[in-house]
Amino acid sequence: MAKTIQAIRGMNDCAPTESPLWQWIEAQVRNVLNSYGYSEVRMPIVESTPLFARAIGEVTDVVSKEMYTFWDNDEQLTLRPEGTAGCVRAAIEHGWIYNNEQRLWYIGPMFRHERPQKGRYRQFHQAGVEVFGIANPEIDAELIILTYRLWKALGIDQHVTLQLNSIGSLEARANYRSALVGFLENHQDLMSDEEKDRLVKNPLRILDTKNPELQKVLDNAPKLLDYLDDESREHFEQLCSLLDAVDIQYEINPKLVRGLDYYNKTVFEWVTSALGAQGTVCGGGRYDGLVEQLGGHATPSIGFAMGLERLVLLVQEVNPNVPVKSAVDIYVVYQGEGTTLAAFELAEKVRSELPHLNTMLHCSGGNFKKQFKRADKSGATLALVIGESEVQNKQVVVKHLQGGADQQTLDLVNVIDYIQTQF
């Protein structure tokens, strides 16, 4: 027997029993985003490597350690580790944002070479939103309110907390960086080699360290909010006022900086305590300089991304009775001479007249006992049964597989009307 081939570590299959929950969550995401007037875009999963180096930052962990990169002839290419850079590239390339506002969303796989663990995988899926051309804090508030509406639709709104911060302008952040480095240089004895490297290359990332001793020290570190420029401070205060007005609860987290270099002003995360260490389910912020940095015109921008794997885990944890639709609603079984054609015709009739229902036709033969076992296993609500007598009398037997009403024999012309009363 040939050796079996396994999935790559950190890249997972989605089983037939799992996909209905994924589909339901993705449907809630699409419904909420479409209800706000946002438009879907689709980008390639492979981009030119310099796109991410320029957008995300060469000294970030994502670019320096986690990207899947390869050579195609003389061009270096990368499997996308996030969606914002590719969306900005597409918007510039196709002129979507020239003298124009755009509110866009996407869903798709991303790739990072990280250590796989619960809620963190090497291939993972994100739903992302990018808004271009709006500088006002109203759009910051809209994105946060939009995500809260999604949490309510998913039944997880009581299990997530909003954390907010402002990291100001590039100049304000540079001033803060100098103050933070000056403070941390006196505590290098508490740092790992990796943290010492960050102190030189990307000191703001030390603010979200998991080192408990360093966390205690950081409680007395300079606060980023104290270094904000006036414009960023006013922007942040207006955002907080808008969230207060619609009763969105939040915590101001002065250590929140996000892991990518392109952010400025508002940054936010939705976090949960229900998933252990992988507590962030959604994060984003403003990136007003990124479009110009990638060759476009100066364009105020803001976005977020949410991890679908973590949303699936969170829904399973806190909302296990979510009303996920079965993959099969109606199962058609048949046995005897002349029943095959009748069963095919009936299944197609149901699919044509009741397209919102999922109808499966038994195709693997066997007696009725075997077929009903398959029907039960499918999760269907109804079985439509055709035997030789039903063909002769132009009738169908309707069997309720989930209990409830008794089995009924109906004239073929009345079957569709009856099915409609059961769903």
UniProtKB/Swiss-Prot annotation:
Alphabetized UniProt keyword annotations: Aminoacyl-tRNA synthetase, ATP-binding, Cytoplasm, Ligase, Nucleotide-binding, Protein biosynthesis
Gene Ontology MF terms: ATP binding; histidine-tRNA ligase activity
Gene Ontology, cellular component aspect: cytoplasm
Entries under InterPro entries matching the protein: aa-tRNA-synth_II, aa-tRNA-synth_II/BPL/LPL, Anticodon-bd, Anticodon-bd_dom_sf, His-tRNA-ligase, HisRS-like_core, HisRS/HisZ, HisRS_anticodon
GO biological process, one term: histidyl-tRNA aminoacylation
Reaction equations catalysed: tRNA(His) + L-histidine + ATP = L-histidyl-tRNA(His) + AMP + diphosphate + H(+)
The protein's Enzyme Commission number: 6.1.1.21
PROSITE patterns, alphabetized: AA_TRNA_LIGASE_II
Subcellular location: Cytoplasm
Signal peptide: none
Pfam families, A to Z: HGTP_anticodon, tRNA-synt_His
CDD domains associated with the record: HisRS-like_core (cd00773), HisRS_anticodon (cd00859)
Family: Belongs to the class-II aminoacyl-tRNA synthetase family.
Quaternary structure note: Homodimer.
Protein name: Histidine--tRNA ligase
Species of the source: Haemophilus influenzae (strain PittGG)
Gene designation per UniProt: hisS
